[in-house]
Regions:
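Small-residue-enriched hydrophobic alpha-helices in membranes
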Residues: 1-128
Length: 128
């Protein structure tokens, strides 16, 4: 899989943290999923440090557009993986609330990712 630069991983990780926080419950399991994403793209960096930086960015910003601009620049393969990781974080508590669904619709629209593909990824994860 294509690797991402550190700045992109931090930005996307901040978006994952945002998705985890949107239901106002940020669990250890969700943190672990974000760290798993970080380790996938940045093998040599400390995932805990990257996560902390992403959490700080998320706490100080609510600029969805900044996060999605990072995603938009990547090939379809990477976009699909990011959407998959966002859904993993969202469904990790076995519940999808209206804010989480709305967030995913907005993100997919902003990165020009079809609703159909987004739904297929979600269903695949729910059925696995």
């Amino acid at each position: 899989m294509t690797k991402l630069d550190k700045k992109s991983v931090i930005g996307i990780s901040a978006l994952l943290v945002h998705a985890a926080n949107i239901d106002e419950i940020y669990s250890k399991h969700e943190k672990d999923l974000v760290k798993e994403f970080i380790k996938t793209y940045l093998e040599k960096d400390n995932a805990d440090e990257i996560l902390k930086e992403a959490e700080e960015i998320e706490n100080n910003s609510n600029q969805l557009l900044n996060y999605t601009n990072i995603i938009k620049k990547n090939p379809l393969e990477i976009k699909k993986d990011i959407i998959k990781n966002l859904w993993k974080v969202i469904i990790s508590d076995n519940s999808i609330d209206q804010y989480e669904s709305n967030l995913m619709r907005r993100i997919c629209g902003l990165i020009y990712f079809s609703d159909k593909e987004c739904a297929e990824i979600k269903l695949k994860l729910l059925n696995s």
